[in-house]
Amino acid sequence: MFVDQVKISLKAGDGGNGITAYRREKYVPFGGPAGGDGGKGASVVFEVDEGLRTLLDFRYQRHFKASKGENGQSSNMHGKNAEDLVLKVPPGTIIKNVETDEVLADLVEDGQRAVVAKGGRGGRGNSRFATPRNPAPDFSEKGEPGEELDVSLELKLLADVGLVGFPSVGKSTLLSIVSKAKPKIGAYHFTTIKPNLGVVSTPDQRSFVMADLPGLIEGASDGVGLGHQFLRHVERTKVIVHMIDMSGSEGREPIEDYKVINQELAAYEQRLEDRPQIVVANKMDLPESQDNLNLFKEEIGEDVPVIPVSTITRDNIDQLLYAIADKLEEYKDVDITVEEEESVGINRVLYKHTPSQDKFTISRDDDGAYVVSGNAIERMFKMTDFNSDPAVRRFARQMRSMGIDDALRERGCKNGDIVRILGGEFEFVE
């Protein structure tokens, strides 16, 4: 089964908790704090495996949860960091944040990695909070929660050549005779319902990857037929091979087929209009094909190369392969993925950090309570052990140092009013 789009849920591992402990040894009075830090939670990492050709593995498992870091231990022993969860994907996979539609990673090279959900930092043990004023702190920090998000995976096949055209024009037959690919071939429309890849070698030992895409019809760019599902795979081909049934056996005019398919390509992605193209006039073994070819050439002019072939008698197949290889040589220095990134703003950094941690907002609930939200304050809330009075006092100091107390006063918050953070309720005290 060919799967090229899927949505999955990711949960990176939480950091391990720091602990509150003290050094207790014979003959060592006032041993001091000895609580170790928690280990780092596992991140969710995507890695390219060139042996994969589909996203099928993600069809049956949609939820991925990475391991939690180990808790700290006494004697200042740190917890063990969790091992990252590595998910293998085929080359050409684009990862997007479902909520924002932001491109998080574009993975094209074997072994390339991207950290998509970052594991939480381990909480600090009480020995990390020792100061001259408080040499034996009696609180520690909980581990930071790992990132959690839904992402979509979209596969754009990395082929040098893309075969496009109406259904039943001979695309699958051509791929089957020039490579070892075994696409399904039948005398009915949409026999091909998934892309097929084949490695093609020319008689002079040049090679390239060719993709046979499901047949397009008018309106494909708007979702008609199967075309819209698979047009994305054309985006990364360096050369488009446009196959046309020159016999007109389906009752369509060859020149109209040519115009309709090009209109659909341009409507889907404007850049495809300028992609190098070779026209293949197929079924030249049938009556009327030569007359139609002459009229076709008169109509489109000499700018677009037209190569007459027959996939049944295999006439001119070698000439076609030479023409494709020559065209690829001509455009070998063109990086389609870079062109695409510049066009749509794809970001290929390994990890995109969340900006501006210190900002916060204050709003009011219907019952009059003040609601404080923001990355930094919510992170501190999650990492605070509210069963520990010293930890609660530290949290209050952090709120003051961030300016949240002053901001609440400016909004009219008075002594005894309710303040909420992530569902937790506090009483404002002057």
Curated annotation (Swiss-Prot):
Its cofactor is Mg(2+). Residues 159-329 form the OBG-type G domain. Pfam families: DUF1967, GTP1_OBG, MMR_HSR1. PROSITE patterns: G_OBG, GTP1_OBG, OBG, OCT. Residues 118-145 are annotated as: Disordered. Its EC number is 3.6.5.-. An essential GTPase which binds GTP, GDP and possibly (p)ppGpp with moderate affinity, with high nucleotide exchange rates and a fairly low GTP hydrolysis rate. Plays a role in control of the cell cycle, stress response, ribosome biogenesis and in those bacteria that undergo differentiation, in morphogenesis control. This is GTPase Obg. It comes from Staphylococcus aureus (strain COL). The lineage of its organism: Bacteria, Bacillati, Bacillota, Bacilli, Bacillales. The gene is obg.
